Amino acid sequence: MAVKIRLKRMGAKKSPFYRVVVADSRSPRDGRFIEEIGTYNPVAQPAEVKIDEEAALKWLGNGAKPSDTVRNLFSSQGIMEKFHLSKQGK
């Protein structure tokens, strides 16, 4: 099963709110997911990002591929750097 870490759109029309979820790559964007690991609110100034770092690192270690936007969010939170350092430490 190919697993992706991606955004699931929530919220009202013209007022998006996203959940960062781990899902099978074949499931629809807003469909079934395996685990919710955070939230992202781009409407707030500045944008609110809350991610469970431990869960994100666990899924990245298990081979889950983040989408481009999620990769940028992880980089801004310092999660990608920690993941790369842990891979080099092996």
From Swiss-Prot:
InterPro entries, A to Z: Ribosomal_bS16, Ribosomal_bS16_CS, Ribosomal_bS16_dom_sf
Keywords: Ribonucleoprotein, Ribosomal protein
Signal peptide interval: none
CC annotations in GO: cytoplasm; small ribosomal subunit
GO molecular function, one term: structural constituent of ribosome
Domain of life: Bacteria
GO terms under biological process: translation
Keyword tRNA processing included in the entry's annotation: no
Recorded family membership: Belongs to the bacterial ribosomal protein bS16 family.
NCBIfam families tied to this protein: S16
Protein name: Small ribosomal subunit protein bS16
Annotated source species: Bacillus cytotoxicus (strain DSM 22905 / CIP 110041 / 391-98 / NVH 391-98)
Encoding gene (name): rpsP
